[in-house]
């Protein structure tokens, strides 16, 4: 079939599309459908038993794929970056690209043709056009880089059409959506992996390796954050600025928990045999910074000068695990301060921390844990001894390829390796659901005055049988 059709051109005007990329392409001024209030957490009750015929997906090994027929849904900034990196992967054939905007679909098609010598089919139009692509091409796997509100719907549809789903962060917004992803993955026996790229950063991989080797003893406490001033998005009409600020007007909670939480959760083996998330209590500061920015930098009649923001500028939550460990999780996308994900893990014999990278412990350096080992020269010996085998193997190439310092390339390489070798994914659907659930759970806790709220057990008790993530080479 032709890349574009008159029907697709007509559909282009009908609504917010599957192609609104994580850094990409929602329609300017088009409202995003955002669940709010108790709609975020209405499926927080204990899970029903797993339906007959469904499969627990922790450690699941799908049949090997000698060649991966891959499709993309959403190729704005984030999706196009994934597309460009997948063009150099062995064993990958990019068969389809879908985006709301015809020009972005064409850009993706042209990139694949120039790099791989074969043109994928392009789809563009309304927000359900991706279904046409799934039905016609039947891809093995799909990479989804759309606005948050469409993640769950598109991923579930992809799995129902026989494709493994790889989804940008967060996996979904509401507990109901997260349960639908878990249930669909189990029913279809298809991987549903949230692509938490930060877990593949050099420091995060090294800390995982050090924790697995027992360098800091028994784990006690972690700290995770997403501190990133994004207020300038209020002046944007394309990309994330077209839809992401809307969440700050609808939800008072941690809107973006997984970048900081994902690595800490895997250090602690949460939902993987050793420990699990139990409850969280959250609090929010006043929401002042965005209205102040809009008043200072935008016209008086601009929508953001006539819309109240409710998401506190700083969101602080404390997570308690079944073993009694604690995790501090913070979000601030508004205040003028340097970027940080915290990335701290503390044990009985030492502490590893990020931003800046620094370590201290009884088994590190000369054992003087009253001072940090930090700075390029002092950390050189730590990297030499503890760099993760995966980073040693492909870190140099990943750094050259770019993508958040190489973490994107390492993540995509592992996805390809796992699919081609029939290995379990490094991040299973239950981890993606648990990490993403901080969004609705912190909103619920804040709405209830900071009362602790329980985490759903997305594994239905089977986390106890799931192996910890190995230090793969």
From Swiss-Prot:
The keyword Secreted does not apply. Binds 1 NAD(+) per subunit. The NAD(+) cannot dissociate. Substrate binds at residues 226, 244, 256-259, 339. Residues 1-31 form the signal peptide. One of its GO terms (molecular function) is nucleotide binding. Predicted to be exported by the Tat system. The position of the signal peptide cleavage has not been experimentally proven. Glycosidase. This is Glycosyl hydrolase family 109 protein 2.
């Amino acid at each position: 079939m032709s890349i574009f059709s008159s029907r697709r051109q007509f559909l282009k005007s009908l609504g917010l599309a599957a192609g609104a990329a994580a850094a990409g392409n929602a329609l300017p001024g088009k409202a995003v459908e955002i669940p709010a209030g108790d709609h975020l957490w209405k499926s927080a009750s204990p899970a029903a038993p797993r339906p007959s015929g469904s499969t627990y997906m922790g450690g699941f090994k799908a049949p090997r794929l000698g060649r991966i027929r891959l499709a993309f849904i959403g190729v704005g900034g984030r999706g196009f970056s994934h597309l460009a990196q997948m063009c150099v992967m062995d064993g990958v054939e990019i068969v389809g690209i879908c985006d709301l905007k015809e020009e972005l679909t064409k850009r993706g098609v042209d990139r694949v043709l120039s790099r791989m010598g074969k043109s994928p089919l392009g789809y563009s139009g309304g927000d359900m056009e991706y279904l046409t692509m799934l039905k016609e091409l039947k891809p093995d796997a799909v990479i989804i880089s759309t606005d948050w509100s469409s993640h769950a719907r598109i991923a579930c549809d992809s799995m129902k059409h026989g494709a493994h789903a790889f989804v940008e962060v967060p996996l979904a917004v509401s507990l109901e959506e997260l349960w639908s992803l878990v249930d669909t993955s189990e029913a279809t026996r298809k991987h549903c992996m949230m692509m938490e790229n930060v877990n593949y950063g050099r420091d995060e991989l090294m800390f995982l390796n050090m924790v697995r080797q027992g360098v800091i003893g028994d784990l006690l406490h972690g700290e995770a954050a997403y501190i990133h001033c994004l207020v300038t998005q209020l002046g944007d009409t394309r990309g994330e600025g077209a839809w992401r600020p809307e969440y700050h007007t609808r939800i008072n909670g941690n809107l973006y928990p997984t970048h900081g939480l994902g690595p800490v959760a895997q250090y602690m083996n949460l939902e993987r045999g050793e420990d699990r998330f139990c409850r969280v209590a959250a609090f929010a500061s006043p929401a002042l910074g965005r209205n102040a920015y809009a008043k200072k930098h935008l016209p008086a009649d601009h929508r953001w000068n006539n819309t109240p923001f409710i998401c506190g500028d700083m969101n602080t939550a404390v997570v308690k695990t079944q073993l009694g460990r604690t995790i501090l999780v913070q979000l601030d996308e508004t205040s003028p301060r340097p970027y940080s994900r915290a990335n701290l893990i503390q044990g009985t014999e030492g502490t590893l921390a990020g931003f800046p990278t620094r370590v201290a412990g009884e088994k590190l350096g000369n054992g003087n844990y009253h001072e940090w080992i930090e700075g390029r020269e002092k950390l050189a010996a730590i990297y030499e001894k503890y760099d993760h085998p995966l980073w040693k193997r492909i870190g140099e190439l990943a750094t050259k390829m770019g993508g958040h310092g190489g973490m994107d390339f390492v993540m995509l390489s592992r996805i390809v390796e796992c699919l081609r070798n029939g290995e379990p994914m490094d991040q299973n659907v239950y981890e993606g659901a648990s990490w993403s659930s901080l969004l609705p759970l912190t909103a619920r806790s804040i709405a209830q005055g900071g009362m602790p709220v329980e985490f759903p057990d997305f594994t239905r008790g089977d986390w106890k049988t799931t192996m910890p993530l190995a230090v793969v080479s």
